[in-house]
Amino acid sequence: MSSQTERTFIAVKPDGVQRGLVSQILSRFEKKGYKLVAIKLVKADDKLLEQHYAEHVGKPFFPKMVSFMKSGPILATVWEGKDVVRQGRTILGATNPLGSAPGTIRGDFGIDLGRNVCHGSDSVDSAEREINLWFKKEELVDWESNQAKWIYE
């Protein structure tokens, strides 16, 4: 990984998996030119979700959110590339799908805040923390993309 690249954590939530949106969501990141370095289907438990959403523990919506996130499989992914954290959030759209622009994942596939299809890290520090929660170091694959020379100067 070069000094200009970073990694982000993107999760397709149970609603996105159940609705068959996985391939369309992954393709948005691939078409942008980002490199997939880790992927797995996960049934999250309370401990993982409490660590992931630590800033929301104790808030009124937290139990319902955890219940939803445990309701089905989550596709956990790690993407690598230049400015991928910020650009990943742009690709996803606003947290509330009704405030998301058409052309974003949430703008195209979401309606309700509680079913917003995806999660994306909101900072480089959050990305590192979330990647370490969801993946073991050996699950992150370091590989050279042949298309990188066509994407980056």
Curated annotation (Swiss-Prot):
Enzyme Commission identifier(s): 2.7.4.6
InterPro entries: NDK-like_dom, NDK-like_dom_sf, Nucleoside_diP_kinase, Nucleoside_diP_kinase_AS
Gene Ontology cellular-component terms listed: cytosol; mitochondrial intermembrane space; mitochondrion
Keyword Cytoplasm annotated: yes
GO molecular function: ATP binding; metal ion binding; nucleoside diphosphate kinase activity
Covalent S-S links between cysteines: none
Enzyme class, first EC level, given as a word: transferase
Segments forming a coiled coil: none
Record PTM text: The N-terminus is blocked.
Places the protein is found: Cytoplasm; Mitochondrion intermembrane space
Keyword entries, A-Z: ATP-binding, Cytoplasm, DNA damage, DNA repair, Kinase, Magnesium, Metal-binding, Mitochondrion, Nucleotide metabolism, Nucleotide-binding, Phosphoprotein, Transferase
UniProt binding sites for ATP: K13, F61, R89, T95, R106, N116
Catalytic activity: a 2'-deoxyribonucleoside 5'-diphosphate + ATP = a 2'-deoxyribonucleoside 5'-triphosphate + ADP; a ribonucleoside 5'-diphosphate + ATP = a ribonucleoside 5'-triphosphate + ADP
Additional facts recorded: Present with 7130 molecules/cell in log phase SD medium.
Its job: Major role in the synthesis of nucleoside triphosphates other than ATP. The ATP gamma phosphate is transferred to the NDP beta phosphate via a ping-pong mechanism, using a phosphorylated active-site intermediate. Required for repair of UV radiation- and etoposide-induced DNA damage.
PANTHER family xrefs: NUCLEOSIDE DIPHOSPHATE KINASE
Family in the record: Belongs to the NDK family.
Binding partners and assembly: Homohexamer and homotetramer. Interacts with TOM40 preferentially in an unfolded, unphosphorylated form.
Protein name: Nucleoside diphosphate kinase
